[in-house]
């Protein structure tokens, strides 16, 4: 198993996330195949938007479930994969995503890849893309923190 191999080789800078790839309706359902606190560092979920209302409702429900689990198991929670393919909604970042994720203690959030070989298969905006200006607004929100932001984590 990957975990054993990492430990055998002295690798201690990798976090393992449990993201079951399902749409749980309860804490119990989410934890059905949970391997245990000694194996997992981060509680996560992968959820993509196909329908706006359904995505918002499911994301809110899953993050609430994960927040409960994170507190019970003393684990950080993360949105390990999310996004809207092609991001055709020009306000997706601030009107769909931000209002929900800002309600929860997420340690991080990751949008899926931008595929060079597939012109419309992307999840992060690029200059001139329909949601690019909204992403800048999302980036500048006091509710978000990016790796390049100036913050004092250890002070």
Residue positions per predicted region:
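Alpha-helical scaffolding within the catalytic cores
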Residues: 20-35, 57-69, 91-99
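Substrate-binding surface in catalytic domains of secreted glycosidases
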Residues: 45-68, 75
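Aromatic-lined carbohydrate-recognition surfaces of secreted/lumenal glycan-active proteins
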Residues: 2-29, 74-88, 111
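Substrate-binding cleft of secreted/luminal carbohydrate-active enzymes
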Residues: 75-155
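Aromatic- and acid-rich polysaccharide-binding/catalytic face
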Residues: 30-56, 112-114
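Extracytoplasmic/secreted cell-surface and envelope-processing proteins
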Residues: 25-29, 51-55, 87-90, 118-121
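Short, non-transmembrane amphipathic alpha-helical segments
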Residues: 1-2, 97
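Extracellular/periplasmic catalytic domains that process cell-envelope and extracellular macromolecules
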Residues: 9-11, 34-39, 70-72, 102-104
């Amino acid at each position: 198993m990957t975990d054993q191999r990492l430990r055998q080789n002295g690798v201690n800078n990798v976090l393992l996330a449990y993201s079951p790839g399902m749409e749980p309706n309860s804490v119990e359902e989410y934890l059905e195949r949970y391997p245990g606190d000694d194996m997992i560092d981060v509680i996560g979920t992968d959820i993509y938007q196909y329908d706006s209302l359904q995505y918002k409702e499911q994301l809110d429900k899953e993050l609430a479930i994960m927040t409960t689990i994170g507190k019970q198991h003393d684990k950080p929670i993360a949105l390990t994969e999310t996004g809207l393919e092609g991001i055709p909604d020009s306000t997706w970042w601030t009107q769909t995503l931000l209002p929900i994720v800002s309600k929860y203690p997420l340690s991080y959030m990751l949008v899926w890849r931008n595929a060079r070989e597939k012109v419309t298969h992307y999840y992060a905006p690029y200059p001139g893309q329909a949601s690019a200006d909204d992403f800048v607004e999302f980036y500048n929100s006091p509710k978000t923190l990016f790796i390049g932001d100036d913050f004092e984590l250890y002070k």
